[in-house]
């Protein structure tokens, strides 16, 4: 199996050293991924340093930061990979709240300050897109279960539904259907309650030591590392616990292509391409981008396979 090497991507320690030694390096790195320097500076100025417990996974070498913040899927800001970085600076992230409702004993509204008050930790995770490309990202956040426990799910709660901000004035893809890929907005996603409570599932508020960029889902997003990236909904404003499986955006649009579970599975191909391998973002050169075999559950099989015991994952994809 092909593995990440130090010649493929930049190690975590080198990123930290660069931040400490060269002031403003993150701005310049971001600018390389943006269509114009002004947008890069404006976005970087909004980011603030976070206090968190560091992760230490020497076997996972980070994708270069400029790739992570410059190569995104966020259709609210356009379908091209560079469009979110170009247009997402219009996203207004303050004030911000998340409403938690539905099958809970204690409905709550969390402010951004309250969300940032949760004990934060770094989670270096693999990210696998359904489009057959991958990254390794140092997210900063907290386990979703911590938030749900405060709301106290009732015995009827079986699923957790999520909803992205709806703001057509500042999210051009919501205003223009063609620009936004023809999706039904606001963007919606969902998990089973067991998936949501799994320790790997986090709400992320940052990456690379700072708060999230708008194009990466600021100010708070879901990260579920064993599922395809479209499950990790961005810019969340609503969380609702339900008794029945919630409607989710991509599954509603094309259910034969995007299942509700969307677990990374090299044995279940997308109707239009293979999922057996993945392109490693940030590896090689222009004509030598490397690929590697895709791992079941994106390499997290040991931690999550038990959630699907008795379930045919080729049918329930």
Curated annotation (Swiss-Prot):
Signal peptide residues on this chain, from the entry's feature table: 1-40
Gene designation: msrP
Residues the entry annotates as binding Mo-molybdopterin: 72, 75-76, 129, 164, 216, 221, 232-234
InterPro entries according to UniProt: MsrP, OxRdtase_Mopterin-bd_dom, OxRdtase_Mopterin-bd_sf
Keyword list, A-Z: Metal-binding, Molybdenum, Oxidoreductase, Periplasm, Signal
Purpose of the protein: Part of the MsrPQ system that repairs oxidized periplasmic proteins containing methionine sulfoxide residues (Met-O), using respiratory chain electrons. Thus protects these proteins from oxidative-stress damage caused by reactive species of oxygen and chlorine generated by the host defense mechanisms. MsrPQ is essential for the maintenance of envelope integrity under bleach stress, rescuing a wide series of structurally unrelated periplasmic proteins from methionine oxidation.
Protein name per the record: Protein-methionine-sulfoxide reductase catalytic subunit MsrP
SUPFAM superfamilies: Oxidoreductase molybdopterin-binding domain
Processing and modification events after translation: Predicted to be exported by the Tat system. The position of the signal peptide cleavage has not been experimentally proven.
Keyword Phosphoprotein included in the entry's annotation: no
Cofactor note: Binds 1 Mo-molybdopterin (Mo-MPT) cofactor per subunit.
């Amino acid at each position: 199996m092909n593995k990440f090497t130090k010649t493929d991507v930049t190690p975590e320690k080198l990123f930290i050293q660069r931040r400490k030694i060269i002031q403003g390096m993150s701005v310049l790195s971001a600018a390389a991924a943006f269509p114009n320097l002004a947008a890069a500076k404006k976005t970087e100025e909004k980011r603030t340093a976070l206090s968190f417990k560091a992760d230490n996974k020497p076997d996972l070498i980070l994708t270069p930061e400029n790739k992570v913040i410059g190569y995104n899927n966020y259709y609210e800001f356009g379908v091209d990979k560079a469009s979110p970085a170009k247009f997402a600076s219009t996203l207004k992230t303050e004030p911000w709240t998340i409403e938690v409702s539905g099958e809970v004993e204690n409905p709550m509204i969390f402010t951004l300050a309250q969300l940032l008050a949760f004990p934060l930790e770094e989670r270096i995770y693999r990210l696998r897109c359904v489009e057959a490309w991958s990254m390794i990202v140092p997210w900063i956040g907290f386990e979703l279960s911590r938030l749900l426990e405060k709301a106290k799910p009732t015995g009827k709660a079986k699923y957790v539904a999520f909803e992205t901000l709806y703001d057509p004035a500042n999210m051009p893809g919501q205003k223009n259907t063609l620009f936004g890929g023809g999706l039904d907005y606001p963007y919606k996603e969902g998990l089973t309650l067991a998936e949501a409570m799994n320790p790997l599932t986090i709400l992320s508020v940052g990456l690379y030591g700072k708060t999230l960029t708008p194009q990466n889902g600021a100010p708070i997003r879901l990260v579920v590392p064993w599922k395809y990236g479209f499950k990790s909904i961005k810019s969340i404003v609503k969380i609702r616990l339900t008794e029945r499986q919630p409607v989710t955006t991509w599954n509603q649009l094309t259910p034969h292509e995007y299942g509700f579970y969307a677990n990374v599975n090299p044995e279940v191909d997308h109707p239009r391409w293979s999922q057996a391998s993945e392109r490693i973002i940030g590896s090689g050169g222009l004509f030598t981008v490397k690929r590697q075999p895709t791992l079941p559950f994106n390499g997290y099989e040991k931690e999550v396979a038990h959630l699907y015991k008795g379930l045919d994952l080729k049918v329930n994809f």
